[in-house]
Amino acid sequence: MKIKTEFFQDNGFLIIKNFYSKKLIYKIKKNIFEISKEIYKKYNSNFLKKNFNPNNFDYFVLKARKERNNEVTSAVYDACKKLSGFYEIISDKKLNKIAEKLIGSRRLGILPGGFGIRIDYPKDRYWKARLHQDYTSQLGSPNGIVCYTPLGNLTQRKGPVILYTKSHKRGVFNTKVDLSGLKKKKTYDPYYIKISKKNLKKYKIKYLNLKETDLGIFHFLLLHESGFNSSNKIRWSMVHRIFDFSHKQAINQNYIGGLMEGNIFDKNKNIKYL
């Protein structure tokens, strides 16, 4: 497989079509269906039998969401991170070789707080990821990649991830804290990138519209945000992050995690903007 390293370095992202097998995707969907069915059944006495359908594998998750059954949706979210099929995605040997070429290092690590399966519900704005860079939120190393594969083909209505191509070349953008959104319960995320609309428009937008066997990769420093899911289906995303242990800044900050682990730049002398 020929890897377009120069394209990645220039644009900050790469899409590899049909990277994962349909069999593996099917396995993960089936596991989610079976787990969500058992959890839903535990909390609902009026349980109706439902057979597995790969195109409707999240039937019980969506049903629980509509019924506002947070016990079910929270339990499913936590359980998804423990699926053996998901670990097959993370530990893929071909992907590791690709990561070595794109990152330019053979000393790679996976951020423990940076992998899981995202569940973006229809019409939900609260959990929509704001404009950010994964280095700021995850740290580990400024030299790293985000690996992204959907469960189910993405459409524009499902709100694919929005990439701002070539923005990684700018380095780390200034990250500010705004608690007003939290207080008004409009968002879970108090952090935002300080950039004008004029400057943001300098970067060409790429929508990460992928099929469920595709692999999307983008740089830790690339600006991106969630699209809005205006469909009536859940947008499922399998995500993990690979970083470079050998990078000087990674060593200086002791490979510490970022905002997602409660570490803010001005509270740790080892953490700094590039």
Segments predicted by a language model, with ranges:
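Short, solvent-exposed loop/turn segments at secondary-structure junctions
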Residues: 20-22, 117, 136, 153-155, ...
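Non-heme Fe(II)/2-oxoglutarate
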Residues: 38, 42-49, 62-67, 173-179, ...
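Short, conserved beta-strand element in jelly-roll/cupin
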Residues: 138-156, 209-212, 217, 241-246
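Active-site region of the double-stranded beta-helix
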Residues: 108, 133-140, 149-160, 166-168
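Extracellular structured ligand-interaction cores
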Residues: 13, 142-146, 158, 205-207, ...
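Double-stranded beta-helix
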Residues: 156-223
